[in-house]
UniProtKB/Swiss-Prot annotation:
This is DNA binding protein VP8. Keywords: Capsid protein, DNA-binding, Host cytoplasm, Virion. Residues 1-16 have a biased composition (Basic residues). Mediates ssDNA packaging into virion, it locates to the internal surface of the capsid, thereby displacing the internal scaffolding protein VP3 during virion formation. Additionally, protein VP8 plays a role in viral attachment to the host cell. It comes from the Viruses. The lineage of its organism: Viruses, Monodnaviria, Sangervirae, Phixviricota, Malgrandaviricetes. It is found in: Virion; Host cytoplasm. One of its GO terms (cellular component) is viral capsid. GO terms for molecular function: DNA binding. Belongs to the microviridae J protein family. Residues 1-38 are annotated as: Disordered.
Length: 38
């Protein structure tokens, strides 16, 4: 799965989203594999 390079602003936005995903994964270890890469 290749990701398109993003502008800095966009990557910051998605980073915030992804930290939420990570936090959920700590509570739900079975979902870990998808983790940061969602």
């Amino acid at each position: 799965m290749k990701r398109k390079p993003m502008s800095r602003k966009a990557s910051q936005k998605t980073f915030k989203k992804n930290t939420g995903v990570q936090r959920m994964n700590h509570l739900n270890p079975r979902a870990m594999r998808g983790g940061i890469r969602l």
